[in-house]
Amino acid sequence: GLFFIDFNESLNISNTAFGFAIGVQMLMWGLTGPIFGAIADRYGGHIAIISAFIFYTVGIYFLYTGPNTGIFFQIHMGLLIGIGLGGTAISIPMSIVGKHFPLSTRTIAMSIVTAIGSFGYFLSPIFTNYSLKEYGWNYTLFIFLLFLITGLLAAYFVRSPSKSESVEKVSDQSFKEALTEAFKTKSYILL
């Protein structure tokens, strides 16, 4: 939402178009999260995160370079960035951390990742607001691109362990079977 005024003034993006793009972004984030989770389970967390970072980076890049009005704004801001969020938000990194640490230290490791992620969520709007005021929306998006490229490079070095630290028996359950089981569980539905 911090970009709205700049997008409205520079690109003539209406609040309806901006709101719709954010709605598409949130929808794509929610829809692709389980898909990236399945990719992480099957091929490794690094593949899921790298794939998501590519979508996120391409979305920001095209938003930065244009064309970024009309349907292009919806594709870049809504679709691509939303898909990227599905695999780069906290859920996939948490699953990777969970697989890397034994039960005895898993809780502290996951707590550290959560704390760092939360601190990032705290700092991000402060930094974004400062950058927008000092440098404008275009340069702020360029800075975001640099952060994303750094994350993409770092994700390349993330490797899933060959064997999870806590899993003794690996389930042969398919993605469809897992979804069916989840939607039959009252706690999952309430969540």
Residue locations for each model-derived region?
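Extracellular/periplasmic helix-loop-helix junction of adjacent transmembrane segments
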Residues: 2-30
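Intracellular juxtamembrane helix-capping segments at the cytosolic ends
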Residues: 7, 87-101
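Residue-level signature of mid-helix packing/kink "hotspots" within the transmembrane helices
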Residues: 26-34, 121-122
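Conserved MFS/SLC helix-loop-helix module at the cytosolic interface between two early adjacent transmembrane helices
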Residues: 31-71
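Hydrophobic core of transmembrane alpha-helices in multi-pass small-molecule transporters
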Residues: 70-88
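Helix-loop-helix hairpin linking two adjacent transmembrane segments in secondary transporters
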Residues: 112-163
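Flexible cytoplasmic inter-helical loops of multi-pass small-molecule transporters
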Residues: 159-177
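Juxtamembrane cytosolic amphipathic helices that cap and anchor the N-termini
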Residues: 180-191
